[in-house]
Amino acid sequence: MGNWITSTFLRFDLFQRHQPNRFLEYTRVQHSNQSPAYSVRTAAEIVAHQRMKPNHSNDSDTDFSSDDEGCPKMTPHEEQQMFEREQHIAFSGRCHIGDPESCTQLRNEINSRCGPRPSTSNNMEFILNRDLQKRGTSISNPRTVARVLNSHLPNQKRRVDRVATKSFCTQYIQNGTKIVVASQDEKIRFYQRNPDKSKYRSKYMKSDELRVDQCGWSILDTAISLNGDLIAYGTWKDAVFVGKLDFTERQNITWFPIDLNGEPGRDHCAVFCVKFSDSSEQIVCGTSQYSIHVFDVEQRRRIRTIVNAHEDDVNSVCFADLGSNLIYSAGDDGLVKVWDKRAWSDGDVEPVGVFAGHRDGVTHVDSRQDERYLLSNSKDQTIKVWDLRKFSNMSGVEATRACVQSQHWDYRWQPAPPGLCQPVAGDTSVMTLRGHSVLHTLVRANFSPESTGRRYIYTGCARGEVVVYDIMSGTVSRRLKGHTAVVRECDWHPTENEIVSSAWDGVTTVWTWDERQEGVIAPYDHPNISQFGDEDSCDELFQPVKKQCRRQRKTMSSRGHPCSSSSISQN
């Protein structure tokens, strides 16, 4: 068996050059007293390593030279410059403009709604921000509000809660007065903001806790109706569960399952995403059976099913416009599709358009609510912005399909392979943003709210960060570090410069702006930038200085206490 293993797998031309000795070691031990199981394990490891290795078709079959041979020599100073340059690119993000005309129109529209981002050193902007932060005080000009908020992006964190389980979903509800968080322990928790007159008015305290009726592995998505009286969730069950929110009787909530297939009790299907329409009369969801379902909430029944809407799991759906006539969907086939409900009455359930350009599955899709632009977040580690007027042609769709089918890695436990940044032929996206990590779970990205002029795109990250991209510059405006595990979802407050995030470390965090942090927090081109978002920046952790009587101060001074004035003068 050892000879068969050797002849089948041990082709040294397939190994990476920088690790030849690792596999040559096997030739030294293959004739020793090793068990067949050891041989099989070694061969399997070689095959797995080959799958993750990029193809070097032009390499010589007998070239075992070091990678350093043939490379230009660099001085230590040049190496340091290269490291700093690559570090700057990694932190500031990368942007590729695919459609200059649409990108210019988008940026002009943003500039007309909020203007250029002012400097935080402007005293007038600080005064406006102070007035804006006062409860009961409002600035009537939306453009001024957007300028103020955009000049004071969140930069410090405040922990809301920590649970001993993974948190999957989080969002603001009831105009930002409450936060809802869904976790793997089959619970949905609500956090209420303290009253405006409270000393800690920016703090959120847990007010309610609901246990779901049925759950498979975890709650995968939650949705709250616009008026806040209905809640829906999806999990590994063949149903969407809907309940009426009544916080006065929160322990007696009744969940009504709406079956997907008319066969209750089956649980091999997953509902990855759930969304209410603006009128709260309908719910749309995407499933692991490649299908999209639309439900009537009042009648609690399924009114439309699009079978094989995608060629793989439907990871995300959303209503595109205020009338809830258009639906965006995204799946593991790497495509984003647009559906028009108005055409369904004629029996036409085909998409009205398709966007192609990703090299791997799409994890989330979001509408800019302007009936023109949308975004998609993908396992190819990019966010793409699309123009609704410019769909992809069939050649672009086929190119995307070929790229997705050529992927042989699993984002749930493997690192992203090289080559994902190469553009796809027929990509019609407006711009492509890169600078965050999409691993382990369906990480979500969204446009910032209307109060910011929808200038930013923010997303969770597998590195435990909240990454905020500026559409105007195409770079990272904020990289909020504070979690120790993947951030699956985050949400921007509808009217204030505040972001909430929940992660697999069980921590729910609210990010706000603090003027004291601007001394150490700056854009990534600042020469003194190091790290920010640390919890030490929060004044809630500062220890208060206790008052001491005069006799105690004299005693400490005579004993040479390290905090006494005499001790300080001696040092």
Swiss-Prot record:
PROSITE patterns: WD_REPEATS_2, WD_REPEATS_REGION. One of its GO terms (molecular function) is RNA polymerase II-specific DNA-binding transcription factor binding. Disruption phenotype: Increased lifespan. RNAi-mediated knockdown significantly prevents Mn(2+)-induced dopaminergic CEP neuron degeneration. RNAi-mediated knockdown increases tatn-1 expression and enzymatic activity. One of its GO terms (cellular component) is axon. Residues 51-75 are annotated as: Disordered. It comes from the Eukaryota. GO terms for biological process: cellular detoxification; determination of adult lifespan; negative regulation of cellular response to manganese ion; negative regulation of transcription by RNA polymerase II; positive regulation of multicellular organism growth; proteasome-mediated ubiquitin-dependent protein catabolic process; regulation of cellular response to stress. Keywords: Repeat, WD repeat. Coiled coil: none annotated. The keyword DNA damage does not apply. InterPro entries: DCAF, DCAF11/LEC14B, WD40/YVTN_repeat-like_dom_sf, WD40_repeat_dom_sf, WD40_rpt. WD repeats lie at residues 162-201, 266-305, 309-349, 357-396, 435-479, 482-521. Gene3D superfamilies: YVTN repeat-like/Quinoprotein amine dehydrogenase (2.130.10.10). Residues 60-69 have a biased composition (Acidic residues). Involved in regulation of lifespan. Required for dopaminergic CEP neuron degeneration in response to Mn(2+). Inhibits the skn-1-mediated up-regulation of tatn-1. This is DDB1- and CUL4-associated factor 11 homolog. It comes from Caenorhabditis elegans. The gene is wdr-23.
